[in-house]
C-alpha cells in the first residue's frame, strides 16, 4: 500500500569522494565535501524529512530513482553504485524518538549499521508533540 508520503525531486551536490569511515570523519569534513544528493519528502507521520545520501571513496555514484509522487514502503528510492555508503536523515524537532542504541553508539564513536526496513525510531503521536 502507498504510505501517506510524497517524494520530491532529488538534488545533487557535487563534491569529492573521501572515505566515510569513522576514523576519517574526524580528520576531514566528509559530510560537506563529499558528493551528496538530497530529497525532501513530506509525510503525514514524520512531517518533512530530508534524506541526504553521501558518496564515498570506492562508492563513486549515487543513483536516485527519478520522479515525484507517492511512494510505497520498501520501494527503491535509489542506490549507491559499488556498495554502501552513508545516509543522513534530517527530521523535524520533536517528531521522532530515535532508538537509544543510536545515542549509545554515537557517544562511544562507533558506527551503527542499519539495514533496509530496520526501525531506527518511532513517530510521536500528534497529542505527544510539543
Region locations from a protein language model:
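Contiguous, well-folded functional domains in the mature portion of proteins
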Residues: 1-130
Amino acid at each position: 500500500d502507498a504510505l501517506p508520503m510524497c517524494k520530491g525531486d532529488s538534488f545533487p551536490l557535487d563534491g569529492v569522494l573521501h572515505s566515510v569511515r569513522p576514523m576519517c570523519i574526524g580528520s576531514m569534513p566528509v559530510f560537506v565535501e563529499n558528493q551528496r544528493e538530497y530529497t525532501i519528502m513530506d509525510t503525514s507521520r514524520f512531517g518533512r524529512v530530508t534524506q541526504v545520501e553521501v558518496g564515498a571513496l570506492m562508492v563513486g555514484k549515487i543513483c536516485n530513482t527519478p520522479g515525484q509522487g507517492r511512494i510505497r514502503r520498501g520501494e527503491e528510492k535509489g542506490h549507491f553504485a559499488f556498495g554502501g555508503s552513508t545516509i543522513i536523515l534530517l527530521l523535524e524537532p520533536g517528531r521522532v524518538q530515535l532508538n537509544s542504541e543510536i545515542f549509545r553508539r554515537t557517544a562511544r564513536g562507533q558506527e551503527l549499521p542499519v539495514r533496509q526496513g530496520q526501525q531506527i525510531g518511532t513517530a510521536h503521536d500528534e497529542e505527544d508533540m510539543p
